[in-house]
């Protein structure tokens, strides 16, 4: 749940409410504190929207979120060509310590480059969002194949794009040390969640 544009108190209130519902259904929830802006606007340079470690400590305790997305110098979307954001790795470490080593997420990871992402993971980031990089990879591969063969069939092209993006994602999984971690995730009994008891609990 992204309540980062709300006031701090409202963010806590709304995130806590949603966390309570999610936990009744055996679901995890990610909250967001500090605003991850838009790359095209240059928002990544605005340190005033970075996550404050003391705020993060209180937010984590009062909301009960399972993961916290923080703002440390990245932004959503595609950066201008040649621009690589400056990530505040020390802030990551400070938030990690303040929240008692809880899982933390980095939004706007696209365009940050291998070195930045690896340093962020080393500093304590557990999850990286980078859908823009995935979409750009698909776009550029599509452009390349259409230049090579303008008459390529649409279905064949999409199948090629899918295989190409799989390789792109697999590379990032390996690079960040995420490979072989599926056993850490537990399946949710969705049949059990549909019992009347759970439905009543949701409405309380």
What are these regions (language model features)?
Residues 133:
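Glycine-rich phosphate/pyrophosphate-binding loops
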Residues 128-130, 172:
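Generic structural hydrophobic/aromatic packing signal, biased to beta-strands
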Residues 144-204:
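Extended, intrinsically disordered, low-complexity segments
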Residues 108-112, 130:
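Short acidic/histidine-rich active-site segments
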